[in-house]
Amino acid sequence: MLTWLTRDSLTFPPLEKALHDPNGLLAAGGDLSPERLVQAYRHGCFPWYQDGQPILWWSPDPRTVLLPDQLHVSRSLAKLMRQGRYQVSFDTDFPAVIAACAAPRDYADGTWITDTMRNAYCELHRRGIAHSVEVRQDGELVGGLYGLAMGQLFFGESMFSRADNASKVGFVTLVNHLRDAGFVLIDCQMPTNHLHSLGAHAISRAEFASYLARHLDQPNSASWVA
């Protein structure tokens, strides 16, 4: 039975209560307050829903992750990065990145990044929890991604690309930055061919929960200064 959250409690049900069909649906309801969002990620779940639906909270099994030491960069991508065609920065325009991620795409109907979702993550950015990666070409924003940094874990949320491999360049730059700062895992949530080509793979929900327990409260040395 699906658990419905109330606004006066930040408690989520145990992850093993998540449904098998649809895979990983853990709870519904609640709100997108900064406190609830932080608690959700610490617990091992994330919000994902369409406009007109209640807020839905997910903890899929298996979970797609990338370990920084297992990042795979193809020869063609490495060559592109050496060419210096794109300029990559962190936290210089979080609102523009999340707006671009929310924009309609040719292969999808609608967007799950609602206005309420955008406002919630912009607040997390103001609090120093959510971060963005900007990829520019000749000063124009052509790619990027955003997510949350907590302890030694980074929770990726969404990425976009308006130029060839721009989001891959941003992602590889981010992973290298996180590895050097002591991060041990990037949560990619759901599988895609794009992420698998970069070295992402699936782990069980139980193994993901083990990473949370061991690394959420450990320090990192990441600098996000623009």
UniProtKB/Swiss-Prot annotation:
Any one Gene Ontology BP term? protein catabolic process
Name any GO cellular component annotation.
cytoplasm
Q: Which reaction does it catalyse?
A: N-terminal L-lysyl-[protein] + L-leucyl-tRNA(Leu) = N-terminal L-leucyl-L-lysyl-[protein] + tRNA(Leu) + H(+); N-terminal L-arginyl-[protein] + L-leucyl-tRNA(Leu) = N-terminal L-leucyl-L-arginyl-[protein] + tRNA(Leu) + H(+); L-phenylalanyl-tRNA(Phe) + an N-terminal L-alpha-aminoacyl-[protein] = an N-terminal L-phenylalanyl-L-alpha-aminoacyl-[protein] + tRNA(Phe)
Pfam hit, one: Leu_Phe_trans
Primary enzyme class: transferase
Q: What is its EC number?
A: 2.3.2.6
- InterPro entries this protein is in? Acyl_CoA_acyltransferase, Leu/Phe-tRNA_Trfase, Leu/Phe-tRNA_Trfase_C, Leu/Phe-tRNA_Trfase_N
Keywords from the named record: Acyltransferase, Cytoplasm, Transferase
The answer to whether UniProt assigns keyword Cytoplasm to this entry is yes
**Highest taxon of the lineage:** Bacteria
Tell me the protein's name.
Leucyl/phenylalanyl-tRNA--protein transferase
Please tell me the species this chain comes from.
Pseudomonas putida (strain ATCC 47054 / DSM 6125 / CFBP 8728 / NCIMB 11950 / KT2440)
User: What does the record give as the organism's lineage?
Assistant: Bacteria, Pseudomonadati, Pseudomonadota, Gammaproteobacteria, Pseudomonadales
Gene giving rise to this polypeptide? aat
